[in-house]
């Protein structure tokens, strides 16, 4: 009888530990942030126009050709994908769930289609990689755009400035 009680208690304890472990795993998965990365541009531009946003009457090209390196002559779409893949690897290593809008250069995706990917996966952050060009060699640095003033990833200083 003691042996049966001991086995039952062991089974209850084991099931409790399994349930606790499963709950912790579910909780960890629930907290995992989703980051969507869009490597800007692609092999071929799409010059047909589309609205710049939902309900907008203002239109622009679906995807432009992008810049090229002034020394390397590397097209922006190639550089953007290289950078995006490195960022993907780093974010995955840090525990984020990463969705890539594109993983190759020869795609046909408009800017609206790219945004729909971020919406589909309910992205916590949508990162669009670009390597902008300028007409002057004195222009240097990075450009970061956080389009909404209520964007929780913006710093207080950026909110004040926008």
Go through the PLM ranges and name each one.
Residues 2, 25, 93:
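Conserved, well-structured beta-alpha core segment at the onset of a catalytic domain
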Residues 30, 71-162:
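Active-site-proximal helix/loop segments of hydrolytic enzymes
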Residues 1-9:
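Positively charged n-region of N-terminal signal peptides that target proteins for export
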Residues 33-34, 39-83:
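Active-site-proximal loop motif in hydrolases
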Residues 17-31:
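Sec-dependent signal peptide cleavage junction
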Residues 15, 22-23, 112-115:
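A generic local structural motif
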């Amino acid at each position: 009888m003691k042996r049966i009680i001991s086995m039952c208690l062991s089974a209850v304890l084991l099931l409790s530990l399994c349930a606790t472990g499963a709950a912790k795993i579910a909780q960890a998965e629930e907290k995992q942030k989703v980051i969507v990365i869009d490597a800007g541009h692609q092999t071929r531009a799409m010059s047909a126009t589309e609205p710049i946003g939902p309900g907008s009457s203002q239109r622009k090209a679906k995807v432009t050709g992008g810049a090229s390196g002034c020394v390397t002559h590397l097209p922006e779409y190639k550089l953007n994908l290289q950078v995006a893949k490195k960022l993907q690897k780093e974010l995955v290593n840090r525990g984020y769930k990463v969705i890539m809008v594109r993983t190759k250069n020869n795609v046909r995706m408009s800017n609206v289609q790219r945004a729909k990917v971020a919406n589909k996966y309910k992205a916590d952050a949508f990162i669009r990689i670009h390597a902008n060009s300028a007409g002057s060699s004195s222009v240097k640095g990075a450009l970061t755009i956080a389009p909404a003033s209520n964007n929780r990833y913006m710093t207080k200083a950026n909110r004040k400035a926008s």
